[in-house]
Amino acid sequence: MRFDIVTLFPDCFTSVLSSGLLGKALAKQIAQVNLVNPRDFTTDKHRKVDDEPYGGGVGMLMKPEPIFSAVESLPILERREVILMSPQGQTINQPLLRELVSNYEQLVVICGHYEGVDDRVLHLVTREVSLGDFILTGGEIPAMALINGVVRLLPGTVAKTESLTAESFEEGLLDYPQYTRPANFRGWKVPDVLLSGNHAAIAQWRYEQQIKRTSDRRPDLLEKWQQEKKQGSREQGAREAGGVGGEITTDD
């Protein structure tokens, strides 16, 4: 996977790209990150990348020319997505990360700054993506989150691939509580079931805790999960009925 990050502040990425699993993945060439500064594509002596908005308004906008020139300087791979990090975009979630991993080999990520970008930049963009319903000073932090989320799903980044499926959001529910040694810390004890060695009981406890935690913290996710589960049950029932009796008929 190739990432081309268009940013006025490439130095922001140095530590993130050299640390932890992300740094190891880049060292193993599982992914490649290329940082491009639109200021390098300005043509005036002041290297100006922003200007006042037409019609008035607060703050400055990033000019379109340096962004277009920066993006157009990049190679175009066959499966490419051009993403603008924007609070108006689709919120990053696990299904989005999996879609990007499955469908693309190159992600061009444009980081806005100031009060945003000239709207004509959207002619370059195939998708707008947001970190959430709040405003930051620029698109760099959301871009880092996007890169991290995508890279950890690439084969070879995480040693134990089963850990990618046994975590929050992968099954539509939040993760269950987890504990390590000591079994008793300041009077807070690890639940007995986790010490029992009974794998079936542990699995049941974890499932129940997932539902409880999701209900307490993200009832919206629980409702969505329940609806999807119901829909899946109906579809399975219809398939089974069709398999046993041939066509499914309804009485008016």
Swiss-Prot record:
Keywords: Cytoplasm, Methyltransferase, S-adenosyl-L-methionine, Transferase, tRNA processing
Any one of the GO BP annotations: tRNA N1-guanine methylation
Gene3D superfamilies found in the cross-reference section: 3.40.1280.10, tRNA(m1g37)methyltransferase, domain 2
Entry GO MF terms: tRNA (guanine(37)-N1)-methyltransferase activity
InterPro entries, per the entry: Alpha/beta_knot_MTases, tRNA_m1G_MeTrfase_C_sf, tRNA_m1G_MeTrfase_TrmD, tRNA_m1G_MTases_N, tRNA_MeTrfase_TRMD/TRM10
Enzyme class at the top of the EC tree: transferase
Catalysis performed (reactions): guanosine(37) in tRNA + S-adenosyl-L-methionine = N(1)-methylguanosine(37) in tRNA + S-adenosyl-L-homocysteine + H(+)
Subcellular location: Cytoplasm
Pfam hit, one: tRNA_m1G_MT
Annotated spans, Disordered: 215-252
Biased composition annotated in UniProt, kind: Basic and acidic residues: 215-238
Primary localization: cytoplasm
GO cellular component: cytosol
EC code(s) of this entry: 2.1.1.228
Family: Belongs to the RNA methyltransferase TrmD family.
Role according to the record: Specifically methylates guanosine-37 in various tRNAs.
Complexes and interactors: Homodimer.
Protein known as: tRNA (guanine-N(1)-)-methyltransferase
